[in-house]
Amino acid sequence: MISIGTDLVHIPAFADQLAQPGSSFMDVFGAGERRLASRRAGNRNAEHLAGRWAAKEAFIKAWSQAIYGQPPVIPEEDVQWALIEVRADRWGRVALDIAPSLDTQVRESIGDYTTSLSISHDGDYATAVCVLSYAVATENR
């Protein structure tokens, strides 16, 4: 393991932020994330996206922790969040897709890596944990 990151999102506050007139907050989500969220009615949309937002934050925190003692490769205000996309398989298990431009920056700073992701919801909260590990070649993959 290289490092771990976690994030917790208050869903009602997140929903309020999404609903603000003129808000461009949806731009932090990739097309696939927005498409999946649009299939959920009402607050389920915000709940779904809150988990995805927590996952993106958890990834950035894990990456930042991996280079502890060094300046961030990308200042937080310059992160292009849509380059970090959460996808799910048909059973709902989640993984991260990191766009090639960002993936290159991550690999240049920490080496060859893989991610493990978990998202959970309980009541008014969504949480995510992201673990960065060194990539290891396996025969069974």
UniProtKB/Swiss-Prot annotation:
What's the EC number here?
2.7.8.7
GO-annotated cellular components: cytoplasm
| InterPro entries membership | 4-PPantetheinyl_Trfase_dom, 4-PPantetheinyl_Trfase_dom_sf, ACPS, Ppantetheine-prot_Trfase_dom
Where, in this chain's numbering, is Mg(2+) bound?
Answer: 7, 57
Keyword Repeat recorded: no
**Catalysed transformations (reactions):** apo-[ACP] + CoA = holo-[ACP] + adenosine 3',5'-bisphosphate + H(+)
Q: Which UniProt keywords apply?
A: Cytoplasm, Fatty acid biosynthesis, Fatty acid metabolism, Lipid biosynthesis, Lipid metabolism, Magnesium, Metal-binding, Transferase
Q: What class of enzyme is it?
A: transferase
* Alphabetical GO biological process terms: fatty acid biosynthetic process
Q: Does the keyword Transferase apply?
A: yes
Where would you find this protein in the cell? Cytoplasm
Name any cofactors this protein relies on: Mg(2+)
List, in alphabetical order, the Gene Ontology terms for molecular function in this entry: holo-[acyl-carrier-protein] synthase activity; magnesium ion binding
The UniProt family comment states: Belongs to the P-Pant transferase superfamily. AcpS family.
Q: Which HAMAP family match?
A: AcpS
Report the protein's function: Transfers the 4'-phosphopantetheine moiety from coenzyme A to a Ser of acyl-carrier-protein.
**Name of this protein:** Holo-[acyl-carrier-protein] synthase
Q: Which organism is it from?
A: Corynebacterium efficiens (strain DSM 44549 / YS-314 / AJ 12310 / JCM 11189 / NBRC 100395)
Q: Which gene holds the coding sequence for this protein?
A: acpS
